[in-house]
């Protein structure tokens, strides 16, 4: 019986790991995980912040360019047919705003899907929607909600859309909780 154990040792060798060695490796891996995982989380948040800032700058520039090219009228203050609307009606729907910034427009704000002699302005934002808000839920990240105040005193968010737009003053904000 003893000879059989010696034969097995020779056959398979005694190169296995001891329990102490395995515990040391597990502890080292645990320490590395404790250091690396928070760094990944921080860099993800930094990336979202950077994306949000870039998207806000692009949309604010688009809104200001629209304002300059459309006789000092912000997008959403006319219907997509180019008819001026009262400030109270501008908050009812964000559809004209989105169309006016993502399609070609005439000087009065009328929307066209193709560039023509009169619909020569825009599109100011690529695609059919606003860029996604990286902090919003996927289903609402590109949606826009129009605010109902010409003066923003306290910015409140409800998380129902990716963006909050105030057409009376051309202000756009991230709308996330």
Predicted feature locations:
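N-terminal leader/signal peptides at the extreme start of proteins
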Residues: 1-17
């Amino acid at each position: 019986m003893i000879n059989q154990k010696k034969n097995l040792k020779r056959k398979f060798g005694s190169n296995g790991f001891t329990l102490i060695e395995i515990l040391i490796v597990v502890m080292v891996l645990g320490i590395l995980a404790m250091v690396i995982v928070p760094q990944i989380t921080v860099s993800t948040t930094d990336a979202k912040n950077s994306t949000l800032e870039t998207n806000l700058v692009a949309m604010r520039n688009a809104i200001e360019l629209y304002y300059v090219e459309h006789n000092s009228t912000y997008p959403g203050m006319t219907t997509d047919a180019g008819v001026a609307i009262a400030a109270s009606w501008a908050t009812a729907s964000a559809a004209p705003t989105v169309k006016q910034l993502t399609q070609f427009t005439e000087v009065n704000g009328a929307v066209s899907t193709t560039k023509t002699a009169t619909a020569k302005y825009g599109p100011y934002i690529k695609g059919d929607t606003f860029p996604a808000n990286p902090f919003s839920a996927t289903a609402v990240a590109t949606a826009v909600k129009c605010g109902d105040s010409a003066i923003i005193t306290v910015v409140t968010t409800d998380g129902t859309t990716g963006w909050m737009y105030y057409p009376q003053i051309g202000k756009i904000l991230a709308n996330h909780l």
